[in-house]
Amino acid sequence: MSESEGLNMEQSRERFANEVDVALAQSARPFAIHNARKVDARGVAEHYWLVSDGSAIIATGNRDDDFAAACASVGLDADADSDSVSSVGSGDSMTGSAGFVTNAAGRMMTPGYVDIHAHGSWGSSFDDGVQGIRMARAGHMMHGTTRQVLSLITNPLDVMCANLQTVRGMMGARPDILGAHLEGPFLALSRKGAHDPECLKDPVPEYVDRLLHAANGCLRQITIAPELPHGIDAICRFAAAGVVPAVGHCDADYATAYRGFDAGAGIMTHMFNAMNGLHHREPGPIPAAVEDPRVTVELINDGFHVQDPMVRLGFGFAPHRIAFVTDAMAATDCPDGHYLLGALDVNVIDGHARLASNGAIAGSTLTLEKAVQRAVLELGFTPTDAVEAATLIPAKAFGFDRANPVTKQPLGLLAPGYAADVLLLNPATWAVEHVWCDAHFLR
């Protein structure tokens, strides 16, 4: 990429980040979409429509008469739609300030994607303060991730506390930010992956309390190796505080992992990665997770972290409990080169991120858009299963699939009462073409 091309890309991305800021700061208006192929966890429906009142989805269906009535109920004219989906966003609707009716022209319509484990994109990390968060969120929003739990890397405890406070401070104005995920510092040294070993700690009560105090309600999940001293106790403490502990970056045997899940851990952090693997005499943490129907199982479907046969195996292990996550770092949707993950140097070659020091995998450059595309077009998953893994299942991990204090309306389905997070996709490539978040049109 030439210097001028790089500058143009940077300017374009900053412009989109600004548009997201402006749109989400405004009151949303009613909108409607029709002539779409709906795909969500409940199945596929042709000639589908939905109407939002500017807050939630209020009506869905496939009868024209019902569509006209639903539009009229929120002051929209069902016959005054755009000539084509490409004209969506013209004029002031680009900033989310106008109500409009969109003819999807046969495109696929899905709920917005929900990523519960990602560290950054577009050259920025969620540890990089307000500016880093807004840029990294814009990168994922561009690819259809309308809601995201912001993963924070292992750092000195004071830094992690400050980063939690930054996330907490942004949540009031940013409905797309669901809260924070701490991947560290309570990880096994032997399974640290791309985490600074100097910053790893045992989860003693003092450290647990410091993190909970700093988070002030914004902490959604924390990854813990349950075999560490005080590990099970820490899981209990976080769960009692309303945080969802996750088992991962661990060397736990089956019994210890089972105890962790029974104590309140509700997630397995990126199954197969940074943990002891399956063995017929030493089963380890994976069977403990897949046997427990309460556990949501994260999986990085990039073909690199987890090979395709193991992705299929994972879906067979835990049907309707696999959540696609990206574990994306700052290099996501960027050229190969040198980047930082926390304080650690990372080299990205052919889209694969590795620590410069020892070659360990250092996150991914995946988007949920690509994870869903791979699932359908390369692995042969049904559209329903692929979309479910990027929408309803991750939402369920935190109770966001029902009314809740964080998102108000539930996430993960295109149905009345659900949040107006909607994507329109190219039906051949599954590429994201248009995005609504919290009833705001963003692209």
Describe each PLM feature range.
Residues 1-75, 82, 87, 429, ...:
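N-terminal metal-binding scaffold of metallo-dependent hydrolase/deaminase domains
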Residues 209, 213-335:
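Active-site core of metal-dependent hydrolases
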